[in-house]
From Swiss-Prot:
GO terms for molecular function: ribosomal large subunit binding. GO terms for biological process: translational termination. The gene is frr. GO terms for cellular component: cytoplasm. This is Ribosome-recycling factor.
Amino acid sequence: MANEIVTTAQERMKHSLASLQRDLGHLRAGRANASLLDRVQVVYYGAPTPLNQLASITIPEARVLMVTPFDKSILKDIEKALYESDLGITPANDGSVIRLVIPMLTEERRRELVKEMGKYIESAKVAIRNIRRDAMDTAKKSEKAKEITEDDLKDLENEIQKVTDDAVKEADRLASVKEKELLDI
């Protein structure tokens, strides 16, 4: 029972960190990253379809994304979806592929992105702390129901805290890596 509580908390914290990593990947850092286009939906046969299912996305240069559609007939639809997305990047259509040149970030925009990143980090930490609280509550209920002893409860609380501290450290590590990436010119 006790191990189950810690394992469940640990798995939930891993999901929070994975979500954080996805969110951080969507922050444009002045260099090409295929995950920038993850949220782009193309209307294909009347249904919104993720861009990465309709085209291959490659990075031929440090600041260039190249979108090569599997079906050339949807090139205009992909271009339209990229224009309408909130990426702030103008697509260049050369007839067979679409190139997206990522502009250099201004210092002001870098600072804004760091602030936005801070919000993502804080919400991930809040989620991790909520998971810890849930695990602690479950452990206390188990002790009240006489499923575990008081000593086991203390050990369990310490283990839950250690897992929480590790998850928060990982969130901070992800933040420092992304901040360095954002602020490097």
